[in-house]
Amino acid sequence: MTYLFENYKRAPIEFVKAEGSYLIDSEGKAYLDFSSGIGVTNLGFQPQVQQALIQQAGRIWHSPNLYLSSLQEQVAQELAGSYDYLAFFCNSGAEANEAAIKLARKATGKQGIITFQQSFHGRTFGAMAATGQDKIKEGFGDGVPHFSYAVYND
């Protein structure tokens, strides 16, 4: 019996520890981490990242975009480099995709967006609409309209 909603079919493995790019299961077996926490820990499990997180947690965990953040500004500047770019920070890939959908539609005035068959963009309504897999969308009714799906290498 589980009290967890099964939004994914879970593999019968429990990871209890991580070292570098490896995950260690409850039996002590090491696995090369190809999932990266599905985006949330894509820097691996490095001691320097752990120390930076501990140091930041001692200061402040979160400050919304309603307020200034010198660290956020510094990272945005590093990302932009010498280009005239702006950064938009998100909590997840689905949120980034939702923002990209909105930005593309607002900037162009067009509604249509093309993604690829067999793609995966997230589980929010806009991200599911962008996803080129019917099985991801089944049971949720009409999604966000105006998506087309191209075939890879066609």
Residue ranges: model-predicted function:
Residues 119-154:
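PLP-dependent aminotransferase-class I/II
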Residues 8-10, 76, 99-101, 133-136:
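A generic local structural motif
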Residues 14-16, 80-82, 106-107, 138-143:
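Solvent-exposed alpha-helices and their adjacent loops that cap or buttress functional pockets
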Residues 24-25, 43-44, 130:
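Short beta-strand-to-turn element immediately C-terminal to the catalytic PLP-Schiff-base lysine
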Residues 19, 91, 117, 151-153:
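Residues at the C-termini of beta-strands that transition into short coil/loop
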Residues 2-3, 30-110, 114:
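Glycine-rich loop-to-alpha-helix module at the N-terminal edge of alpha/beta enzyme cores
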Residues 1-19, 59:
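Active-site-adjacent loop/helix segments that line or gate small-molecule/cofactor pockets in enzymes
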Residues 13-33:
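Active-site and channel-lining beta-strand-loop segments
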